[in-house]
Amino acid sequence: MKTVFAILFLAFIALTYARSYEDVKEEIKNEVVKEILEDLEEESDELDDKSKEINDAKPYRWLRNKWWRRIRPDIRMAGKK
C-alpha cells in the first residue's frame, strides 16, 4: 500500500512539475518574443531617423558648396583682370 501511495505521490509531483515547466517555458518564450519585437521597433525608429537625414532633395549639396568655395576666389580674381 505504501508503494502505491509513493508511486501516486511521485506521479503527482511529476505532473505538477511538468505543468509548471510548460508554463515557465511558455512565459520565457513570450518574454523573448516581446524583447525581440521591442528591439525591432527601436531599430526601425533608428532607420527612420537615418532615412530622414539621407532623404535630401539635393544629396550632393555639401560637395557643390565645397567646390564653389574653392572656385569662387578664382572667379573673383578673373573678374578683376
Curated annotation (Swiss-Prot):
<dbReference type="GO" id="GO:0005576">
    <property type="term" value="C:extracellular region"/>
</dbReference>
<keyword id="KW-0472">Membrane</keyword>
<keyword id="KW-1052">Target cell membrane</keyword>
<feature type="modified residue" description="Alanine amide">
    <location>
        <position position="78"/>
    </location>
</feature>
<keyword id="KW-0044">Antibiotic</keyword>
<keyword id="KW-0391">Immunity</keyword>
<comment type="function">
    <text>Antimicrobial peptide with a broad-spectrum antimicrobial activity. Keeps its antibacterial activity under a wide range of salt concentrations that mimic physiological conditions of human blood, which is surprising, since Hydra is an obligate freshwater animal with nearly no salt tolerance. Does not affect red blood cells.</text>
</comment>
<keyword id="KW-1053">Target membrane</keyword>
<keyword id="KW-0964">Secreted</keyword>
<keyword id="KW-0929">Antimicrobial</keyword>
<comment type="similarity">
    <text>Belongs to the arminin family.</text>
</comment>
<feature type="signal peptide">
    <location>
        <begin position="1"/>
        <end position="18"/>
    </location>
</feature>
<protein>
    <recommendedName>
        <fullName>Arminin 2a</fullName>
    </recommendedName>
</protein>
<keyword id="KW-0732">Signal</keyword>
<keyword id="KW-0027">Amidation</keyword>
<feature type="propeptide">
    <location>
        <begin position="19"/>
        <end position="57"/>
    </location>
</feature>
<keyword id="KW-0399">Innate immunity</keyword>
